[in-house]
């Protein structure tokens, strides 16, 4: 486990999302690029919803390496050929979306995640919520998931930009 690498990943990933959307005009930000696609604003809102923190009010000892599930998470979220539908609780609302407000929220989420990575014991198992098909994840794995999930949607944003 490498906290410095994770901290760098969080900062770099969220910085890349912000960079990719900051110069997009409001019309393009909220334009549906093709049928059954989200807008850049919807993808950004989805990232914001999914990156608000780690469910870790109740924790315990993992009894395993804190990054044991990392390869499986990478295989799931970095495979761009696999598509899945977002669950209702993380589905963004319909456009329009306020670009600057979402950028501000991305920045707040990034800072919150960085504080978790720097200040908390990442080896602890988060017992508040199970990850589908994997069970409980450590804080390290949850933060890694958030990065991988965000990277996946950064790719989606870039693909949408090419269609506009």
Where are these regions (language model features)?
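Short, helix-capping/interhelical loops that line the mouth of catalytic, cofactor-
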Residues: 1-5, 53-105
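Charge-rich, low-complexity N-terminal segments
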Residues: 2, 6-9, 13-39
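Residues that form generic nucleotide/phosphate-binding pockets
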Residues: 9, 20, 76-79, 105, ...
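Structural signal for well-ordered, non-membrane alpha-helices
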Residues: 14-22, 51-55, 110-121, 154, ...
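Acidic interhelical loop/turn segments
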Residues: 22-33, 91-97, 111-142
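Short, contiguous alpha-helical
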Residues: 31-78, 123-164
